[in-house]
Amino acid sequence: MVGSDGRSMMIANAGNSIVLDNLWKTYGSFVAVGGVSLSIEAGKFCTILGPSGSGKTTVLMMLAGFSEPLRGNILIDGNDVTRLPPQKRNLGVVFQNYALFPHMTVFDNVAFPLRMRGLHTAEINLKCRQMLDVVELGGFSGRYPKELSGGQQQRVALARALVFEPRVLLMDEPLGALDKRLRAALQVELKALQRRMNVTVVYVTHDQEEALTMADQVVIMNHGKIEQFGTADELYDQPMTEFVAGFMGDTNLIEGVVTGRAADGILRVEHPTGRTILAQNSSSAIGDQVSVSVRPECVSIEAATAPISEEPNSWSGRIANAVSLGDAMRYTIVVGENRPSLQIEMQAKASRRGAHGHRFSPDEAVRLSWNANDARVLPRRKK
């Protein structure tokens, strides 16, 4: 669904709601967006995820029409809108600061885009009442933005963006100013509303939890390019790069060299200590310098009551730190303590009292293991 051949992708995906075809945007010599090609299915919730400066907001601004690409094309429902002004694209937009008119009531804020489109008063009144009911603000139509909570202001902005029935809703960090509890509640509400209205959403955020909670499709950007595109589960369980593995959540990255291939696409990787790791990936070749990604929750931890096994994916170490997460414990384990130059720290996540009813303490000797299908071989990032 992502490719460098923007022209062929545009033809193949003309039925999709949104197609970005080889978009570029520069500021002087700085490349903000470099050759982004992407197709987003109609009715899907697509999150563009990345750190500050990754180009995600620039992509959204080009899609909205607030910024013009240096080259490339933007299609919405098969129509080229690259050079159209924002008001002719029929897109709803919600920003982090909501951009509500402080001198207007809730009703007038929501009615504003309808009045700009020249609708009759009776139709405006009906659409506004219906939309305010949808966002559960039917009794707040006469209030002003300053009289509302942050969550209520966000709902007004959302109602204003949806009241004219846009083809696509664009959202730039819309929950960023809210506290964690309210943010979590509104994530659920927003996803439910998107499904109910069957609107295509493009949602920019740096928050991995928001992407995992709401998105049907996730785009991860870094340095102006797309690192990976897929479902949240695909990106979490099957990252293609070290950056994606780390950005989608905590992970252990263990360096090594591919030394062989086992059955079912499992690779054999040798760590500098001589320990063998088995992990998934069909694209790496023998001799490649790689990193193996293993999520902390996939690492089994038990007391080292017997000599360490020589089996692959079986390591010994000592607890360096133990942190309670409420329903679970996160352990930091130093592995390879007999060879200081090759020591690494690994993370493991276990239930409060461990799989065998034991809660581990700092400096306790432990054994770590994981399944080959829970580990993924990734190309080593250049340093």
Predicted feature residues:
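Conserved coupling/switch loops of ABC nucleotide-binding domains, chiefly the family-specific signature
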Residues: 70-73, 123, 223, 255
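Non-catalytic connector elements of ABC transporters
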Residues: 3, 251, 260-383
